Every structure is written in C-alpha cells, then in structure tokens.
Amino acid sequence: MDKKYDFSLSYEALTRVCENAICEHIRRAGSLEGLGFALEYTKAYAILEVWSLLAAAGDTFPALIEKDRIYLLQLISGKNNIEPH
C-alpha cells in the first residue's frame, strides 16, 4: 500500500452493500450446522463491525448510524422489525 487512493462511497451505498452481505451470510447459515453455521454468523457480525467503524468515520448523524446499526443487528438476530432509514 505504497500509493494512496481516494474514493467516495455514500453512506447509503455502504449500508446497502453491508446489508446485502449480512443477508447472504444469514441465508447461508440457514442451511448449515455446527461450525459452518457459527462461521457464517461470525462473518455477519464482522461486517456489522466494519460498517460501524466506516459509518462513524464519515460525517453522518449519530442518530442515523445508531438506527441503522440496530436494524443491521436485528437482521443478524432474526428480529428485523425495524425498517432501515
């Protein structure tokens, strides 16, 4: 990583990409047992962690980040009764 590259990604695009990736890992976990099941959920939580770090690094309102964090967490836990922003 000798060269520095800048790129732009909207908060909405970041959230959408992470939401889709989380949903894919949860979908895969549904057909697995044991270690495979646990690994897919671990990947989903890792995506949530990276999303949280990137969202906080941007200039987004903390209340919006918290609402979306809860939404993504509920996707992982299966309690998705909150709509995304």
Language model regions located:
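Long, C-terminal folded domains that constitute the functional core of proteins
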Residues: 10, 21, 71-77, 81
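Short, charge-rich amphipathic interface segments used for partner binding and complex assembly
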Residues: 35-78
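N-terminal acidic leader/helix
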Residues: 2-38
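Short intrinsically disordered terminal tails
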Residues: 1-4, 81-85
